[in-house]
Amino acid sequence: MRQPHIAALLLLPLLLRSGTEGARTLRACGHPKMFNRMVGGENALEGEWPWQVSIQRNGIHFCGGSLIAPTWVLTAAHCFSNTSDISIYQVLLGALKLQQPGPHALYVPVKQVKSNPQYQGMASSADVALVELQGPVTFTNYILPVCLPDPSVIFESGMNCWVTGWGSPSEQDRLPNPRVLQKLAVPIIDTPKCNLLYNKDVESDFQLKTIKDDMLCAGFAEGKKDACKGDSGGPLVCLVDQSWVQAGVISWGEGCARRNRPGVYIRVTSHHKWIHQIIPELQFQGRAGTQQQQKDSQGQQRLAGNSAPCLAAHAMVLALGALLLRIV
């Protein structure tokens, strides 16, 4: 009988398609369909920052975040001081205007929140959390993940990056309705310079703040432009090898856009291992031209690049070919 090999041949295109779709999903990160880069506190365009999400409590926006996988959002730990009732939280994806989310937007309930256990309070290290959604979202032109960097990616001082959010435009004002997503280009500031800035003009009732090793500064010494209240947990992204990679998570600052007080972010690369422990299937963006590897739980080396799904499909094809030879 030759019928088994016919069934196997019918499975072949399905296996090839599965591998191709996996590779396409991985390539989706950091590649929005819309490009329009203007410097300085401007309205974003629809689909321009498709990983930006609004984290809401009882239907009200209180923090930003970034989609990093179909069921996971990266944000700040200080956004979740109390998670005893997880049912009050939801995530809004694919929206440009908070008050008028539009047809491309999607509300998804929160399943659980995992804060970094090393986090000890405002302005401390490890101010990162992972929000798991109730179910996976389908990637569209308006809902796409941002790439996360592995430790090989260095964000140099002076590098121009972007911060986005629905936070207040200043310490006194609230973003006017319909609350359009804002974008701002900010340069990276090296840690020694940032510490010097935060040591200037220190008021007597303020505790001196230190930029820790897992923190990253971005902004302007003269102030005037910065993230503000309501932006917390949102992404600081930089263009690396033609992909948008998240360098930091909005964490803290003194006021908003004050002189000598640039924004402080948590370095994503500093918490690469913790993120990978919770989401082992998540792949990280390495430097161009390098083949990044990670060890699985058994200590075996495995590829961490976009070729993995293709290699898996290739292996299945070889196995299927061997099966056909045995059958015929």
UniProtKB/Swiss-Prot annotation:
Cellular localization per UniProt: Secreted
Keyword tags: Disulfide bond, Glycoprotein, Hydrolase, Protease, Secreted, Serine protease, Signal, Zymogen
TM ranges: none
Disulfide bonds: C63-C79, C161-C238, C194-C217, C228-C256
Record GO cellular component, one term: extracellular region
GO molecular function, one term: serine-type endopeptidase activity
Alphabetical list of Gene3D superfamilies matching this protein: Trypsin-like serine proteases (2.40.10.10)
SMART domains: Tryp_SPc
Glycosylation sites: N82
Tagged with keyword RNA-binding: no
Any one of the GO BP annotations: proteolysis
Class of this enzyme: hydrolase
Superkingdom in the source lineage: Eukaryota
Family to which this protein belongs: Belongs to the peptidase S1 family.
Protein name: Serine protease 27
Organism expressing this protein natively: Mus musculus (Mouse)
